[in-house]
From Swiss-Prot:
Species this chain originates from: Homo sapiens (Human)
Primary localization: cytoplasm
Cofactor(s) needed: Ca(2+)
Record: residues binding Ca(2+) 1: N153, D155, D157, D165, D176, D179
Active site per UniProt: C645
Group of enzyme by EC: hydrolase
Protein name: Protein-arginine deiminase type-1
Amino acids binding Ca(2+) 2: D155, D157, D179, K364
The entry's keywords: Calcium, Cytoplasm, Hydrolase, Metal-binding
EC code(s) of this entry: 3.5.3.15
Expressing tissues: Detected in epidermal keratinocytes (at protein level). Epidermis, prostate, testis, placenta, spleen and thymus.
GO MF assignments: calcium ion binding; protein-arginine deiminase activity
Gene3D superfamilies, sorted: L-arginine/glycine Amidinotransferase, Chain A (3.75.10.10), Protein-arginine deiminase, central domain (2.60.40.1700), Protein-arginine deiminase, N-terminal domain (2.60.40.1860)
Chain sites annotated for binding Ca(2+) 3: E353, D371, S372, N375
Amino acid sequence: MAPKRVVQLSLKMPTHAVCVVGVEAHVDIHSDVPKGANSFRVSGSSGVEVFMVYNRTRVKEPIGKARWPLDTDADMVVSVGTASKELKDFKVRVSYFGEQEDQALGRSVLYLTGVDISLEVDTGRTGKVKRSQGDKKTWRWGPEGYGAILLVNCDRDNHRSAEPDLTHSWLMSLADLQDMSPMLLSCNGPDKLFDSHKLVLNVPFSDSKRVRVFCARGGNSLSDYKQVLGPQCLSYEVERQPGEQEIKFYVEGLTFPDADFLGLVSLSVSLVDPGTLPEVTLFTDTVGFRMAPWIMTPNTQPPEELYVCRVMDTHGSNEKFLEDMSYLTLKANCKLTICPQVENRNDRWIQDEMEFGYIEAPHKSFPVVFDSPRNRGLKDFPYKRILGPDFGYVTREIPLPGPSSLDSFGNLDVSPPVTVGGTEYPLGRILIGSSFPKSGGRQMARAVRNFLKAQQVQAPVELYSDWLSVGHVDEFLTFVPTSDQKGFRLLLASPSACLKLFQEKKEEGYGEAAQFDGLKHQAKRSINEMLADRHLQRDNLHAQKCIDWNRNVLKRELGLAESDIVDIPQLFFLKNFYAEAFFPDMVNMVVLGKYLGIPKPYGPIINGRCCLEEKVQSLLEPLGLHCIFIDDYLSYHELQGEIHCGTNVRRKPFPFKWWNMVP
């Protein structure tokens, strides 16, 4: 709204004013009055609402034919309910009277031209633009909240372009309009009024680099859509055609929330009278938007597509591993996409390269890949092969000296939805690995951490992963879906559970059963040898302490009980003070619904079965899960990674709408 408008009346000549439908105009009835006048009477033509604003303690409302006292504590306000068909077709008359006179001492006449001007967006979050009588400028979270939403137009709808749509200041395809939020400008009133007044669309300077606005002229040609606001373009004089009552615009988001951007932008339209110097703004209507956040999907969401790389090394190709992935995705009814060697340049760690998420508005949703700053062999794959129609792309570059291992996205995960001490996280919480507090070790880059935090809907939790050589959270934790009330379990790697299992097997008489039995390229280690190895015992005592520290953080920050956690047997060893998996790390699995692709641990064979596999099955299969153990030893484990590191899963978005939560 514009500041309070005051229309001054005159006894000498009629006054003319523009009145916006639904907007009150204050009328000055005190400045020009006949000498001796002490009361007045008001009348208005049909379509004009006249009412008095007065101090009830000092002014008495007249009854019947009595007149209003000409008191400074009584003010007149007028408004119109519809737009005028002609100029000055609404009329208000004010008659002034003296002490004992029935004849008016003088009269003032006010001619009003009604105009209907409003800027409308989807404040109700229904996917449709409807006329709103409420607050359009403010943005509120929650199921009772309101406010429009913008998508960052980070996909590429035109195959002829090599860049995301948001990089272009012109429309690349009509499909691109679906990624934008519609905005309607109502501009109903006499054409002659718009001939002498301007409608100006504005974007604040601080928001101009965050949005673009395209004006639609109803055609099916790209030339019918012109950019009118955006970077380097802060205002636009609307080109209204004679008789035109509604003009459609499309608003495009350009930047995600980040450390320097809360995600809120505003646009406004003003009715301006250029007939005065300086020009006078008669009315302003403002609408607000929030940029949709980038949202991660946890393992509990159904899988849609699994990505894996075809590679070649000194041991040959990973063709057998690819066959196992094909079998797993077939069981899980999930699409399989194999990245060829020419595109991955023999970089197999596709989990480290990128993270899949999505963005959503009431009218549209699409997946968005977050490209990590690691920039190794796969660095071009997300941009060149995944970015496309309705598949967006975002990244964050980091300054020199460049990325550390903790900047890879094996060090980025998200929990299922949780409730912590009465606080709900309906989209879960992001988990990232870091150094031990105050230790000065490796950390994920600030640019990435700031981006994740700024999305607001999945408040990040920092864990301690710097004790590991690679330093990724997926080396000691994962989540699996369950069909019970909780809906999931947290799996934690557990050296103590593994040593306990081996001790039990020793006491049962299987001490000579050997780890790595069946592997050609690895020396066997019997249970007796492993239990007697003081260095191995010491290393795993350290690893267990590190995992226990994270266990307590996860219980506190995710609201978990011990019954929500499953300990998966696992041993580690220290190399240059950092831990690596002693045998294939089973929590580093890929989760496809109820089917789990688990690294084959090559544990001691007892009664024809691997005791580690048997233990894991006994823990997980009662939860309705199917354990499929897959050999990744040569192609992944020996290179300090496992199945999760070498795969990536795009999952279905949450059914829950992010705008219904309260961060």
